[in-house]
């Protein structure tokens, strides 16, 4: 089916001015920051195998912060900006902004956001929020950078006229507008909205960072590179716009599926679940359109930019259907918090988005006059990256399934850690081809044959006159529909934030007022300092602080979290991953001496623990804690204290005030209303088989007991 497909043919013999300097600058910055971010990721992954390896480096959590922000803002941000400087003049027929504004944006993005942001998080100044780790001063600069990008790239489209825009233009406009709207929501709002209510806004940003920033710009690249490389129009302009509006209407509704079975109201969770399944259908439309647009190019296209774009489309289909599957409540119960989710995120950012980013940079770079490009190096990089990322994602997916199986049972937590070790080793090994692939792409841009002015920008310019002629037959009603849809899109974004952020906050506030046993217990100065240490070291990336409403969580960690428990948490630290156990009920479960020994040398207490040690918080031994260690201990001892003090009167009051006990997060006595710091009874211990021998008993002792008992 072809409807107005002539709009979608970015090939002609003329081109408006393209600022090659800014294309090159952002391209080189993209790969430089990518390699640094990958280095952080490798160091983070190696600690799963060698927990004491990075003692001379910043802590695991700090490097994890630097890794995620480096991938999203450093690598993808710069790659997308490089592509925009090339594509916007072609798509709009007008140059993008000004050279001076572009240089200011480049300096702001890299020398005021990325470098200071990395220095700050590695120095301990950060936010414990997923995809929002840079501290507030840097967040303000990021918002300013996005505003400058909008000023730089949006006016050419406005002057061009909405009714004649190609779909890549729409994705670019949508990304710039909606990222400006959503970034403050996930990076600023949780600092002022506590607990689960703040987590609702974080959940929206976790998904919008990918869905309204990364995905639209990646799809803009794919819809540009595919027809420019094949010399054919896209299969269907109608399907491309259907996919565009489906994405922007549904993505903002997905965020709360990151908190299924949490204390966030079930209505918000159900909305996100339904939207997640519908989004899967939209993705199938987008992917079908892009795949059919490549017909005749072969399974492995000869054009290297098209080859990366083609694999990006495949990754996009897999990761999107995987996301819809994860929204299923039964499946989420099994895999949430596991490495299955980490594999999913790597497939999104290092698979789909990264391959699209490479395709965009390569396509733009080879069209610039006097640019070098090593096609042999790019060919090797393609295969190394494809194999490496595939192995990494498959490995993490299997690890997540194994972890989920252990967590659903009654096996000790450490059993899941031991079972995960082989998968963590493979994950680190898979970083070798991935890193080599990225190095080769960077090398390819700096070596090889040079292009000439005659085969530079002219070879891929959009046929703007032809495109305009193709759209002059559109009816006034259809032209008006673009404007109506644009206004509706912004309105629907506001509606989604209200539905999944504002209304849940109000509901949680009402529940807190009705169910809280009394005024909130304020943290002491030492506990506040300890909370800051917990946040800066990234403890919430290993330990959640939410006991979900699942049988497995209740059996393992005790009574589920209630709305009022997080009413003083600014920002929340519910967490989105469990490498270690949940800590929401830590108070009074361990002795002071145990905690201090565990902080100083985790493996002296739990022999097979992979938790990082914090000897810098001590004066040379576990019995000589410095103030940081005592403050962190004070905070750990505060977790769950208020709930423990309120039991059982607080839960009885909750039952009296509501009929729908589970919906309002209250509990039933004896079945669920256990002491909140205690787990459910598990029955008699299984008898050892008659064939058990001394060697087996010794291994059990060594793995589980020797740390404390010598």
Give names to the regions the model predicted:
Residues 211, 532-544, 567, 581-600, ...:
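C-type cytochrome heme c attachment motif
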């Amino acid at each position: 089916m072809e409807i107005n497909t002539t709009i979608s043919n970015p090939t002609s013999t003329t081109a408006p001015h393209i600022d090659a300097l800014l294309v090159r600058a952002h391209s080189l910055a993209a790969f430089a920051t990518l390699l640094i971010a990958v280095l952080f990721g490798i160091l983070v992954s190696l600690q799963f195998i060698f927990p004491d390896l990075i003692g001379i480096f910043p802590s695991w959590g700090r490097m994890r912060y630097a890794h995620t922000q480096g991938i999203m803002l450093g690598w993808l941000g710069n790659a997308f900006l490089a592509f925009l400087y090339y594509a916007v003049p072609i798509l709009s027929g007008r140059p993008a902004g000004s050279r001076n504004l572009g240089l200011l944006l480049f300096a702001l993005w890299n020398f005021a956001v990325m470098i200071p942001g990395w220095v700050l998080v590695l120095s301990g100044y950060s936010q414990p929020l997923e995809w929002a780790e840079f501290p507030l001063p840097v967040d303000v600069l990021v918002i300013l950078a996005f505003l400058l990008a909008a000023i730089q790239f949006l006016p050419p489209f406005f002057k061009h006229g909405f009714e004649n825009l190609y779909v890549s233009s729409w994705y670019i406009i949508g990304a710039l507008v909606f990222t400006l709207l959503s970034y403050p929501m996930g990076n600023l709002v949780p600092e002022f909205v506590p607990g689960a209510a703040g987590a609702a806004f974080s959940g929206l940003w976790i998904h919008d960072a990918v869905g309204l920033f990364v995905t639209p710009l990646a799809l803009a690249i794919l819809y540009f590179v595919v027809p420019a490389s094949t010399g054919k129009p896209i299969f269907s302009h109608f399907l491309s716009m259907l996919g565009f509006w489906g994405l922007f209407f549904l993505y903002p509704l997905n965020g709360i599926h990151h908190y299924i079975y949490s204390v966030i109201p079930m209505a918000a969770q159900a909305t996100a679940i339904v939207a997640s399944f519908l989004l899967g259908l939209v993705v199938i439309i987008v992917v079908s359109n892009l795949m059919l647009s490549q017909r005749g190019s072969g399974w492995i296209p000869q054009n290297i930019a098209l080859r990366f774009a083609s694999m990006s489309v495949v990754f996009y289909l897999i990761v999107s259907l995987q996301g819809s599957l994860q929204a299923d409540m039964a499946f989420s119960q099994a895999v949430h918090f596991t490495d299955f989710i980490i594999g999913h995120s790597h497939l999104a950012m290092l698979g789909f988005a990264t391959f699209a980013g490479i395709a965009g940079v390569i396509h733009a770079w080879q069209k610039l006059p006097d640019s070098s490009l090593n096609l042999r190096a790019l060919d090797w990089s393609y295969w190394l990256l494809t194999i490496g990322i595939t192995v990494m994602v498959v490995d993490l997916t299997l690890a997540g399934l194994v972890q989920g199986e252990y967590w659903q049972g009654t096996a000790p937590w450490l059993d899941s850690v031991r079972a995960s070790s082989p998968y963590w080793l493979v994950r680190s090994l898979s970083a070798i081809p991935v890193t080599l692939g990225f190095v080769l792409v960077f090398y390819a841009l700096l070596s090889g044959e040079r292009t000439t002015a005659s085969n530079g920008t002219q070879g891929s310019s959009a046929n703007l006159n032809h495109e305009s002629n193709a759209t002059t037959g559109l009816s006034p009603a259809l032209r008006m529909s673009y404007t109506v849809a644009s206004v509706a899109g912004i309105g629907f974004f506001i509606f989604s934030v209200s539905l999944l952020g504002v209304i849940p906050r109000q509901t949680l506030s009402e529940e807190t007022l009705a169910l809280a046993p009394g005024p909130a217990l304020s943290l002491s100065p030492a506990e506040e300092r300890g909370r800051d240490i917990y946040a800066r070291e990234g403890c919430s990336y290993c330990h959640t602080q939410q006991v979900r409403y699942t049988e497995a969580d209740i059996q393992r960690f005790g009574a589920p979290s209630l709305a009022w428990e997080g009413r003083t948490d600014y920002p929340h630290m519910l967490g989105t991953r469990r490498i270690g156990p949940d800590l929401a009920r830590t108070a009074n479960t361990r002795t002071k001496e145990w905690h201090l020994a565990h902080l100083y040398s985790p493996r002296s207490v739990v022999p097979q623990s992979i938790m990082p040690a914090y000897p810098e918080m001590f004066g040379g031994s576990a019995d000589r804690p410095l103030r940081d260690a005592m403050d962190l201990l004070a905070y750990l001892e505060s977790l769950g204290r208020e709930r423990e003090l309120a039991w059982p009167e607080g839960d009885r009051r909750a039952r009296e005030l509501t009929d729908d006990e589970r919906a309002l997060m209250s509990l039933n006595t004896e079945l669920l209303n256990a002491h909140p710091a205690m787990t459910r009874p598990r029955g008699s211990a299984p008898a050892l088989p008659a064939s058990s021998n001394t060697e087996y008993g010794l291994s059990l002792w060594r793995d589980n007991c020797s740390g404390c008992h010598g």
